[in-house]
From Swiss-Prot:
The EC number(s) this enzyme carries: 1.2.1.27
PROSITE patterns in alphabetical order: ALDEHYDE_DEHYDR_CYS (PS00070)
Record text on subunit structure and interactions: Homotetramer.
Signal peptide: none
Residue pairs linked by disulfide bridges in the UniProt entry: none
UniProt protein name: Malonate-semialdehyde dehydrogenase 1
The keyword NAD is assigned to this record: yes
Highest classification ranks of the organism: Bacteria, Bacillati, Bacillota, Bacilli, Bacillales
Sorted UniProt keywords: NAD, Oxidoreductase
Record: active site: C288
Gene3D superfamilies hit by this protein: Aldehyde Dehydrogenase, Chain A, domain 1, Aldehyde Dehydrogenase, Chain A, domain 2
Gene coding for it: iolA1
Length: 488
């Protein structure tokens, strides 16, 4: 990703209710992954820009924390209404900026809207606890209070949903927020800020600062930032977690994944194939809940044959085409990295059942890669261990469910796993022994709804409190205990 000098209008940061040009002089291109068309330029903001945003958020917090909870919730209801009004427009922006298929983009917006719905329930979510007579004439109460200024660092693969995981809940809890979106998908963040302001959010409650590494470090290190929420790759997630935690700040860092789908001998083949295809190749495999490894228990050549047939039938192209499922990866540089993984799989002895590289020449204008399937992959191979984040699927073989579960246990990641079976005993064993935080039973993408935590395990998550659900409320609030005596 090359740095260029600005030649055209550059996106601005949103600070204190105003669109503000970055003090930095460099920008990055924001190309459409399907066409290469440059949609905008995003500024490489500076430490000074971050400080300006944090100071605006700090100033806003002084009054926002005292805004009655029902009034905060009403702003969320207004925001929810505006997101619904602009649903189609936002989905088209996701397609243009991220590249995914329109149907998936529309679904992403819907998931984000559901997060705002959850945040709108703040009066219930923020209720404290009390107990009378903990001792004679003594009562105890617990109240929730906001932390202050908090920050979110979000990825390119869900440029709408992940910010909506974070800032609505943080803000309705009484905090103010600084959002650093991915420099690959910055346009949508500005649109969110615009709609949130229209919904009635006061200046400084939500701020957006674009940029790269310097912005991340400046947010982590700023003395007025109380918590960091991050979603991204494993090396960066670990870095963000360690650097933030070392300063005694709250941090939740969602990381990489290697999600295994187990196909049992009694599985309905067509159902399993349909779910694996959608999970592995939807969004070009660029999601942390994507199926990237299938473990076939016993002999099931029918499943393998049908999987390849369905992969061959996939329509590849621009996400605005309603027939398209498989869309481009985000950047040419990422595709080059994926090609290296494919070559590594060949060199390490996996059988290349379907070579997605052949589709590249048909679409030279975009970052396309066809569905790629390796068979007879072993757990020690690179493609079986590392997150590739692309439409590349590994098929592993296991003699029984115990062996299949051992593959999941050996993985450094623990985001999700799925089993396809009709056997209740196998389901229970899988539920109890699969070493991952989100499990699917005949479900291809077992991602949770907003009222449950998004609960990755092992190297898929660094921190104590997950995003969403009660964990999210606990992350963005602190508790104050009051003990009262009445025997005077």
């Amino acid at each position: 990703m090359s740095i260029t000098k600005p030649e055209t209008t550059v996106l601005k940061n949103y600070i204190g209710g105003q669109w503000v040009a970055s003090s930095g002089t460099e920008t990055l291109e924001v190309p459409n992954p399907a066409t290469g068309e440059v949609l905008a330029r995003v500024p490489i903001s500076t430490k000074e820009d971050v400080d300006q945003a944090v100071q605006a958020a700090k100033k806003a917090f002084a009054t926002w924390k005292d805004v009655p909870v029902p009034k905060r919730a009403r702003i969320m209801f207004s925001f929810h209404h505006l997101l619904n009004q602009h649903h189609e427009e936002l989905a088209e922006l996701v397609v243009q900026e991220n590249g995914k298929a329109y149907k998936e983009a529309y679904g992403e917006i819907q998931r984000g809207i559901e997060c705002v719905e959850f945040a709108a329930g703040a009066p219930t979510l923020l209720m404290g606890e009390s107990l009378s007579n903990i001792a004679e004439e003594i009562d105890s109460e617990m109240f929730r209070y906001p932390l202050g200024v908090v920050a979110g660092i979000t990825p390119f693969n869900f440029p709408m949903m992940v910010p909506l995981w974070m800032f609505p809940l943080a803000i309705v809890c009484g905090n103010t927020f600084v959002l650093k979106p991915s420099e690959r998908t910055p346009i949508l963040a500005n649109k969110l800020a615009e709609l949130f302001t229209e919904a009635g959010a006061p200046p400084g409650v939500l701020n957006v600062v674009h940029g790269a590494h310097e912005v991340v470090n400046a947010l982590i290190d700023h003395e007025d930032i109380r918590a960091i929420s991050f979603v991204g790759s494993q090396p960066v997630a670990k870095y963000v977690y360690e650097r933030t935690a070392a300063q005694g700040k709250r941090v939740q860092a969602l990381s990489g994944a290697k999600n295994h789908h187990i196909v049992m001998p009694d599985a309905d083949v067509e159902t399993a194939v349909q779910h694996v295809i959608s999970s592995a190749f939807g969004s070009a495999g660029q999601r942390c809940m994507a199926c990237s490894a299938v473990v076939i228990v016993g002999e099931n050549e029918t499943f393998v044959r049908r999987l390849k047939q369905k992969a061959d039938e996939l329509i590849i192209g621009n996400g605005m085409d309603p027939e398209v499922l498989l869309t481009p990866v985000i950047r040419q540089s990422h595709r080059e990295k994926v090609l290296g993984y494919i070559q590594k799989g060949i060199e390490e002895g996996a059988v290349l059942l379907r070579d997605g590289r052949k589709e590249m020449d048909d679409r030279p204008e975009g970052n396309f890669l066809g569905p790629t399937i390796f068979d007879y992959v072993t757990p020690d191979m690179t493609i079986a261990k590392e997150e590739i984040f692309a439409p590349v699927l590994s098929l592993l073989r296991a003699n029984d469910l115990d062996e299949a579960l051992s593959y999941i246990r050996k993985s450094r990641y623990g985001n999700g796993a799925t089993i396809y079976t009709k056997d209740a005993k196998a389901v229970r064993k899988f539920r109890e022994e699969a070493d991952a935080g989100m499990l699917g039973i005949n479900v291809g993408v077992p991602a949770t709804m907003a009222f449950f935590p998004f609960s990755g395990w092992k190297d898929s998550f660094y921190g104590d409190l997950h995003v969403n659900g009660k964990d999210g409320v606990n992350f963005y609030t602190r508790k104050k205990m009051i003990t009262s005596r009445f025997d005077f």
